[in-house]
């Protein structure tokens, strides 16, 4: 079974608000992995619809975040994962003030119903269900400096993993259902005028592929991630600011690594980066992250207490 008693999930996401669970590893029963990830992202160019342009009014838009994350092994086949990021945004030019505060609390249940070894290869399937909700009363109608979109979400992801020796590939796809939000004005314009403070949020599909090297102490992988908004969104109008229900598509490439210390096998160091190569109504961001995670073995603690 591809589980690691002394290693931890690659919890650092391509999207800080949701993607903390998409690898082919399960936390062992009664093990709790927890830690923090610091992430820095910035961009000075963005896509207005499909037209790429410079961000002269705001200069460089940057986002710093510190996320607390955890993963508990209910069983070897069932994990519960959570994350809560604190985010700070800033623009190097213009008059818009940056924002800071808690973003969204996310909770994911990860289940592995199938795993089989055939010859030298191991095949496994996973199902993941996730929920997220705003953890503070931030404003969504303040893009691109808002902390998030403030929409409650529900997601379902199916994932398959193939490993032969220490080399692996993982592919997954998710549908993200987003709830409507309310904003602090009574009318707004998309493709037409809306006389309400309620904004209908479009759903999204996420497809993720990763390939790399996986051992008990080292994981290194290349990642391709595609986020596509479904029908209901619209493009940023010319020379205007973004709106929460814009179509927001992003194709990202990245690298993730995790190293488990030999002398402290419960402690792991993670790091990585990702870059937006194609997009629609999003910034062309470059993102770098690093973090530390530690595993507590509650089963071992209980056994020691019983002695």
Residue ranges, per PLM feature:
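Transmembrane beta-strands of outer-membrane beta-barrel proteins
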Residues: 34-36, 80-82, 107, 123-129, ...
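Short loop/turn motifs that connect adjacent beta-strands in outer-membrane beta-barrel proteins
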Residues: 22-30, 77, 115-124, 166, ...
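Residues that define the transmembrane beta-barrel architecture of outer-membrane proteins
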Residues: 30, 62-66, 100-105, 123, ...
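Transmembrane beta-barrel domains of outer membrane proteins
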Residues: 25, 37, 69-71, 110-112, ...
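Outer membrane beta-barrel transmembrane domains
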Residues: 47-49, 54-56, 193-307
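Transmembrane beta-strands of outer-membrane beta-barrel pores
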Residues: 38-44, 84-90, 113, 131-137, ...
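Outer-membrane pore/translocation modules
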Residues: 95-199, 245
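Surface-exposed strand-loop-strand hairpins of Gram-negative outer-membrane beta-barrel proteins
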Residues: 40-65, 144-146
